[in-house]
């Protein structure tokens, strides 16, 4: 009897274990499918945005053609013979077009009038490749003749060798040879065709160069910011090179990332870039940065390239590209009546930095003759000790004593982890939003791999509703309301505070972490995520 009972118990344990494993496997598969559907939905959303932008582009191009037609008609009006061979219907249409007094919208020819002197000034003089379109990520690599050493082949090998077969079908790498000497350009093309024959024939790699007529006269530029004549010429041409490359790349994919011809890439860089962009698909970002150096690793959404190129062309003679990019952000979101800190907070929502860096600069000799640049990205090999999220613009403050520059501001912006000396009862961390925010969820994670014990204990999460009168009418919130108007909605457990924010508390003016008891350890916050409601 005892043996029989043991057999039954064993069978029950086996069946229970089997059912549990089956349930867990089904749940895990369902979760993975849901995540895959979410990624596909975000990708579809981006493609629809691209399609809408291209429709507007076609409309703009049709208006440009119409303007050109008007100019031709105006020139022909002086000659009756020039119009005699048209039908009566066409002549009526010509008359209607001539009589319309439409305003003239500035375009690229306004800033670069020399382009009107030659047909094909905006068409590549050399174009090698299949012209692949419809990809997720377009990578642009400008290159020019270097007097000492070219790093182009090493750069391409680093990018291509770290792509999986599937990833090679979802991107295109454009090499822009910024030279008008066709003999030199063709030598570069021949060299790349020999080294990367498979990649070019498959459509992964393209090579283009601009016509000589694309460039204006660069010999009489005004010297500014203490730069020499040669440096002003170099940076001005560089701005024009970037614009040509971006205009060519815009229609090919969802995202465009700017690289250089003297870099190396990290393993899995492509999937990291794509997944990070998809995670932020609901955010109103303009630049994602995957390197802290210059223009390396700066990624844009295809529709935004129009604005960026237009802005650069307005001031291409005045300042370097990285300065102009910062000015675009300032114009979009900074209030002249607010201080620099407020401006930086606003810009941080448009310019989001990913760490650790995915690209490292390796070139010693600059494309500017005689310039040695020992530039390295210090974040390239750093382990990631914090997680990056886009949080609502807010003024952050704390009563805790910060350790070695690991400030709360940097953590909130996703630039670093927050590290502070031993908390005591009454200490707080406060996030005061620039404007009331509808918050869907919150997440605060303390400790990190190097200091796992530096966690928050006996700490609560509290929110301050913007509409206090409505909240006070609810009987179920009385016990959660504090004397200063905040409502306690959660607490840290095992170093983590995570949960939803009830809709009746929204919108929220501020969020606070309050320490209830003295702690025996220091504290690290390595992740802060205040997730806005998508409908906000």
Swiss-Prot record:
Which residue stretches, if any, does this entry annotate as coiled coil?
Answer: 28-54
Q: Which residues lie on this side of the membrane: Cytoplasmic?
A: 1-6
Cellular component terms per the entry's GO annotation: extracellular region; Golgi membrane; peroxisome
Q: Which residues lie on this side of the membrane: Lumenal?
A: 28-536
Q: Which InterPro entries match?
A: Glyco_transf_54, MGAT4_A/B/C_C
Stated membrane topology is: Single-pass type II membrane protein
Subcellular localization, as worded in the UniProt entry: Golgi apparatus membrane
Q: Which biological pathway? A: Protein modification; protein glycosylation
Disulphide bonds in the chain: none
Q: Which cofactor does it need?
A: a divalent metal cation
Q: How is it modified after translation?
A: N-glycosylated.
Q: Which residues cross the membrane?
A: 7-27
Domain of life, source organism:
Eukaryota
Q: Give the principal location in a single coarse category.
A: Golgi
Q: Any one Gene Ontology biological process term?
A: protein glycosylation
- Activity regulation details: Inhibited by UDP.
Keywords of the record, alphabetical order, are: Coiled coil, Glycoprotein, Glycosyltransferase, Golgi apparatus, Membrane, Metal-binding, Secreted, Signal-anchor, Transferase, Transmembrane, Transmembrane helix
Name the catalysed reactions. Answer: N(4)-{beta-D-GlcNAc-(1->2)-alpha-D-Man-(1->3)-[beta-D-GlcNAc-(1->2)-alpha-D-Man-(1->6)]-beta-D-Man-(1->4)-beta-D-GlcNAc-(1->4)-beta-D-GlcNAc}-L-asparaginyl-[protein] + UDP-N-acetyl-alpha-D-glucosamine = N(4)-{beta-D-GlcNAc-(1->2)-[beta-D-GlcNAc-(1->4)]-alpha-D-Man-(1->3)-[beta-D-GlcNAc-(1->2)-alpha-D-Man-(1->6)]-beta-D-Man-(1->4)-beta-D-GlcNAc-(1->4)-beta-D-GlcNAc}-L-asparaginyl-[protein] + UDP + H(+); an N(4)-{beta-D-GlcNAc-(1->2)-alpha-D-Man-(1->3)-[alpha-D-Man-(1->6)]-beta-D-Man-(1->4)-beta-D-GlcNAc-(1->4)-beta-D-GlcNAc}-L-asparaginyl-[protein] + UDP-N-acetyl-alpha-D-glucosamine = an N(4)-{beta-D-GlcNAc-(1->2)-[beta-D-GlcNAc-(1->4)]-alpha-D-Man-(1->3)-[alpha-D-Man-(1->6)]-beta-D-Man-(1->4)-beta-D-GlcNAc-(1->4)-beta-D-GlcNAc}-L-asparaginyl-[protein] + UDP + H(+); an N(4)-{beta-D-GlcNAc-(1->2)-alpha-D-Man-(1->3)-[beta-D-GlcNAc-(1->2)-[beta-D-GlcNAc-(1->6)]-alpha-D-Man-(1->6)]-beta-D-Man-(1->4)-beta-D-GlcNAc-(1->4)-beta-D-GlcNAc}-L-asparaginyl-[protein] + UDP-N-acetyl-alpha-D-glucosamine = an N(4)-{beta-D-GlcNAc-(1->2)-[beta-D-GlcNAc-(1->4)]-alpha-D-Man-(1->3)-[beta-D-GlcNAc-(1->2)-[beta-D-GlcNAc-(1->6)]-alpha-D-Man-(1->6)]-beta-D-Man-(1->4)-beta-D-GlcNAc-(1->4)-beta-D-GlcNAc}-L-asparaginyl-[protein] + UDP + H(+); an N(4)-{beta-D-GlcNAc-(1->2)-alpha-D-Man-(1->3)-[beta-D-GlcNAc-(1->2)-alpha-D-Man-(1->6)]-beta-D-Man-(1->4)-beta-D-GlcNAc-(1->4)-[alpha-L-Fuc-(1->6)]-beta-D-GlcNAc}-L-asparaginyl-[protein] + UDP-N-acetyl-alpha-D-glucosamine = N(4)-{beta-D-GlcNAc-(1->2)-[beta-D-GlcNAc-(1->4)]-alpha-D-Man-(1->3)-[beta-D-GlcNAc-(1->2)-alpha-D-Man-(1->6)]-beta-D-Man-(1->4)-beta-D-GlcNAc-(1->4)-[alpha-L-Fuc-(1->6)]-beta-D-GlcNAc}-asparaginyl-[protein] + UDP + H(+)
Which residues, renumbered to this chain, are glycosylated? 77, 458
Query: EC top class, in one word?
Result: transferase
Molecular functions (GO terms): alanine-glyoxylate transaminase activity; alpha-1,3-mannosylglycoprotein 4-beta-N-acetylglucosaminyltransferase activity; metal ion binding; protein homodimerization activity
EC number(s) reported in the record: 2.4.1.145
Q: What does this protein do?
A: Glycosyltransferase that catalyze the transfer of GlcNAc from UDP-GlcNAc to the GlcNAcbeta1-2Manalpha1-3 arm of the core structure of N-linked glycans through a beta1-4 linkage and participates in the production of tri- and tetra-antennary N-linked sugar chains. Involved in glucose transport by mediating SLC2A2/GLUT2 glycosylation, thereby controlling cell-surface expression of SLC2A2 in pancreatic beta cells.
Q: Which family does it belong to?
A: Belongs to the glycosyltransferase 54 family.
Q: What is this protein called?
A: Alpha-1,3-mannosyl-glycoprotein 4-beta-N-acetylglucosaminyltransferase A
Q: What is the lineage of its organism?
A: Eukaryota, Metazoa, Chordata, Craniata, Vertebrata
Q: Which gene encodes it?
A: mgat4a
């Amino acid at each position: 009897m005892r043996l029989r009972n043991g057999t039954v118990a064993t069978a029950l344990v086996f069946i229970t274990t089997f059912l549990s494993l089956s349930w867990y496997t089904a749940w895990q598969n369902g979760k993975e499918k849901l995540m895959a559907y979410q990624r596909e939905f975000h990708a579809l959303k981006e493609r629809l945005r691209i399609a809408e932008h291209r429709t507007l582009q076609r409309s703009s191009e049709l208006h440009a053609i119409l303007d050109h037609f008007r100019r031709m008609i105006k020139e022909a009006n002086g000659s009756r013979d020039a119009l005699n061979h048209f039908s009566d219907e066409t002549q009526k249409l010509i008359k209607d077009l001539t009589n319309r007094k439409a305003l003239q919208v500035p375009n690229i020819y306004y800033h670069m009038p020399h382009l009107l002197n030659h047909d094909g000034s905006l068409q590549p003089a050399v174009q090698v490749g299949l012209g692949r379109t419809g990809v997720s990520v377009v990578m642009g690599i400008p290159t020019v003749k270097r007097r000492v050493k070219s790093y182009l082949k090493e750069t391409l090998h680093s990018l291509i060798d770290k792509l999986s077969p599937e990833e090679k079908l979802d991107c295109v790498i454009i090499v822009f040879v910024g030279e008008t000497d066709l003999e030199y350009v063709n030598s570069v093309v021949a060299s790349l065709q020999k080294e990367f024959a498979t990649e070019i024939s498959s459509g992964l790699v393209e090579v283009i160069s601009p016509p000589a007529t694309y460039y204006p006269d660069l010999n009489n530029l005004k010297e500014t910011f203490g730069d020499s004549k040669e440096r002003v010429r170099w940076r001005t041409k560089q701005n024009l090179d970037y614009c040509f490359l971006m205009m060519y790349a815009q229609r090919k994919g969802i995202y465009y990332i700017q690289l250089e011809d003297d870099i190396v890439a990290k393993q899995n860089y492509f999937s990291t870039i794509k997944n990070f962009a998809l995670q932020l698909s609901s955010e109103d970002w303009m630049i994602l940065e995957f390197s802290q150096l210059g223009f390396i690793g700066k990624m844009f959404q295809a529709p935004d390239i129009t604005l960026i190129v237009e802005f650069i062309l307005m001031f291409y003679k005045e300042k370097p590209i990285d300065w102009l990019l910062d000015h675009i952000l300032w114009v979009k979101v900074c209030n002249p009546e607010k201080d620099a800190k407020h401006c930086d907070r606003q810009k941080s929502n448009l310019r989001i930095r990913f760490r650790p860096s995915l690209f490292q600069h390796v070139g010693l000799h600059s494309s500017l003759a005689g310039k040695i640049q020992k530039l390295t990205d210090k974040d390239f090999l750093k382990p990631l000790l914090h997680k990056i999220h886009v949080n609502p613009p807010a003024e952050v403050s704390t009563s805790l004593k910060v350790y070695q520059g690991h400030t709360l501001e940097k953590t909130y912006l996703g630039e670093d982890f927050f590290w502070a000396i031993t908390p005591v009862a009454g200490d707080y961390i406060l996030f005061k939003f620039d404007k009331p925010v509808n918050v869907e969820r919150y997440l605060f994670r303390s400790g990190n791999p190097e200091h796992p014990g530096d966690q928050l204990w006996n700490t609560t999460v509290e929110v301050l509703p913007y509409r206090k009168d409505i909240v006070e009418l609810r009987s179920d919130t009385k016990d959660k309301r504090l004397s200063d108007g905040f409502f306690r909605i959660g607490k840290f457990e095992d170093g983590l505070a995570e949960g939803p924010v009830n809709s009746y508390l929204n919108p929220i003016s501020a969020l606070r972490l309050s320490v209830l008891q003295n702690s025996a350890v220091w504290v690290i916050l390595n992740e802060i995520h205040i997730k806005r409601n998508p409908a906000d």
